[in-house]
A protein has these predicted regions:
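N-terminal/domain-start alpha-helical segments
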Residues: 36-38
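Short, extreme N-terminal segment that most often corresponds to the first beta-strand
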Residues: 1-25
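Short Gly/Ser/Thr- and Asp/Glu-enriched loop/turn motifs at secondary-structure junctions
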Residues: 2, 41-43
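Charged interaction segments
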Residues: 21-32, 43-99
Length: 99
């Protein structure tokens, strides 16, 4: 199943972006990443997308480690870092979708 993960981190910092992408790649080596860009509605934040072709079990395992409290349906959900536990302290927002 093809999945897309939208990632927003809380600082425009290339080293931080690399660290977060490295963590994501460790959790899911199948991810490919779009170029990052400044997040238009959040001052000082950057965003990018990660895509992969994953099995149902891989999706379940990944969702369990990315965040502890997703909102929404299993295959279309999101989470904010200010009120949940993210896989990295600088992740502000995640949206996970099957496409």
């Amino acid at each position: 199943m093809l999945v897309r993960l939208h990632v927003v981190i809380d600082k425009e910092d290339e080293d931080m972006e690399k660290r977060v992408k490295d963590k994501l790649s460790f959790l899911c080596a199948k991810f490919s990443y779009s170029p990052s860009r400044e997040q238009p509605s959040l001052n000082g934040c950057i965003e990018w997308y990660a895509t992969a072709d994953l099995s149902d079990q891989e999706i379940n395992d990944l969702l369990d480690v990315l965040n502890n409290d997703w909102d929404g349906d299993h295959y279309d959900c999101d989470a904010y870092g200010f009120n949940t536990k993210m896989f990295d302290e600088n992740v502000y927002y995640l949206q996970f979708q099957t496409i």
